[in-house]
Amino acid sequence: DSVQKIKELGIIDEMKKYIAEGRIKHLGFSIHAPKEVLLDALELYDFDFVQIQLNYLDMIHEPGYEGYEILTERNIPVVIMEPVKGGMLANVPAPLNAPFTNYNPNYSNASYCFRFLMQFPNIKIILSGMSSLEQVKDNLNTFDKEEVFTKEMADAIEEVKNNILKIKKV
């Protein structure tokens, strides 16, 4: 398995040298694997961060929310990849996204993805693949305003998620 291979190759010892030399400041890793692999990897080193996939549609995607909880319990900051599921959640069509429009028509589909993740205090970075100036501005607008994640927003997100799941196998 990959964790055993990392041990065999002495990768962590090599990284420790780079840290001592100042070539690496923060050591972390990205994972798409079951929680058991995450737990094994965390035994290798006192990592500065771990990157996982998480979005309102993929709460159980390995390691998913369970991975977030494990990392939070260990005080390891979390970096999020795929917050809009490769763009799919940014392009949820009407009428599937009607609950978003009803909650706040000024918010983009993507902004709901980010607002959902901002409720988790141990998420320190949310990666966002942007391909236009409009998307950059939307992201800046979303992250510029601190907003309480309300039950009404959570309900809107849950309803959109259920609308998507009714028509699409994820």
Language-model features: where?
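Short beta-strands and strand-loop turn motifs
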Residues: 1, 49-53, 80-81
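Distinct, well-ordered alpha-helical segments
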Residues: 3-14, 33-46, 64
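Catalytic beta/alpha-barrel core
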Residues: 5, 28-33, 51-58
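Acidic, His- and aromatic-enriched active-site or binding-groove loops in soluble protein domains
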Residues: 16, 48-60, 105
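Structured C-terminal cap/extension of enzyme domains
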Residues: 17, 44-46, 65-170
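Short beta-strand/loop segments at the ligand-binding rim of alpha/beta enzyme cores
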Residues: 18-28, 77
